[in-house]
Amino acid sequence: MTKRMSVFTALIILSLLFSACAAGAPAAPAGGGESAAAPAGGESAAAPAAGEKMVTIGYTSSLTGKLNVESIRQTNGLNLWMNQVNDAGGIQLADGTAVKFQSKFYDDESSGDRVQELYTKLATEDNADFLISPYSSGLTASASVIAEQYQKPMITTGAASDSNYTQGYTLVYQAYTPASKYLTGAADMIAAGSPDLKKIAIVHENDKFSTDVATALQSYAEGKGYEIVLFEGYDSGTTDFAPIINKVQQAAPEALLGGGHFQDGSTFARQLAERGLPLQYLVLLVAPPEPSFAELGDAAVGVAGPSQWEPQAAYTAEAADAAGLSWYGPSATDFVAAYEAAYNEEPSYHAAGGYAAGLILQAAIEQAGSVDAQAVKDALDSLDQLNFFGHIKFDTTPEAHGLQTGHEMVYVQWQKDDSGNLVKQIVWPAEAKTADALTPVR
């Protein structure tokens, strides 16, 4: 396995030297724009040569709407994986077939109604062989119904809600750590760093994902003896958090946990800083791990958040050996270098998740030795390996089929280095941290 994957990685690295300058190199989609790797509504590759099999991957991306920041980066990661595999000659099957990929994708406009319409089109008109989910749990719930209805295996990324995997689906597989575990580590971090702290406020966006996270956190924190002094939701699209902040001030928590997505989380953090509320810990979903969160300046200092992946996370071939797992794919260093070369920006965990979704599908196809949907499903059911994104393993029980059981979160916090520059540090778990948590926040 190690030797085979070394060859795989070498091919990928060599291909990047050419693809970074090629006309087909991926470009970050902008609002309303198209990715060079996957033009909206069109194929991303020419007709297959002799001995090649062209496989169609279908998905939607929120090029417009409130989810565009996270979704575009997820799409960038997926397109990078696809271009690398194709440039390296495809996935080689035992019978000599080289499997290459083309994509069909559409702008879902961050709309669940559009997702159902477009995934139906992907399954019935575009004849996609495999599906990748849109970004967000709400949109993925809409896509999952279609994937199951038309028996199309779908890798979900950017979709952490547990509830999507308790619907009896058998072809939907989650790359992310489930929402129920998104913020529970924050309670553990606080307990370890500030054992006398007891009062926590939970403020969350009223969407499927954020509500699942908040509800699971409330139960977990209460079980650890914390007093939840405020449990409050806010509407998606909220831009004025003054009424919420007033309630937080009245409740006088020592720590504030919650949030939702990038736009609301960034705005909430900025307005909290402007009000100067005294907090020992401020832990928000989704927004803090994004590199662009640093644009908040001093308002970003001390803000922490769970991340599905960070470049510093120690997922390596050596770690796989130590854990008794097989290692698959490129290293985090190789992924980061490739992404930065292609998009001229640091990859966020959303970008890593998009790439990981492709890598999971690739591993399943290789293990199955086929692109037959049932064979790939069987391979996904038995997958248990470590890649640059983390441990990948799926629940195969009828009650939660496809739920991710291997992957774990890391927690980042924005701090200032000795030169006064904002930097992200891993502050939890203890075995992965690069710095102690900065507390109090204000």
Pin down the residues of each PLM region.
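Short, polar/charged alpha-helical segment
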Residues: 70-94, 215-223
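Segments of small-molecule ligand-sensing domains
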Residues: 338-351, 362-424
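Short, low-complexity disordered leader/linker segments with a strong preference
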Residues: 1-56, 149, 441-442
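Extracytoplasmic ligand/sensor domains, especially the bilobed periplasmic-binding protein
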Residues: 76, 128-231, 280-314
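Beta-alpha junction/loop-to-helix N-cap segments that form part of ligand/metal-binding clefts
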Residues: 69-76, 91-166, 175, 234-241, ...
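Extracytoplasmic "Venus flytrap"
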Residues: 58-81, 106-112, 135-136, 203-212, ...
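Hydrophobic alpha-helical
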Residues: 137-148, 253-275, 357
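Extracellular/periplasmic periplasmic-binding protein-like sensory domains
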Residues: 273-355, 424-441
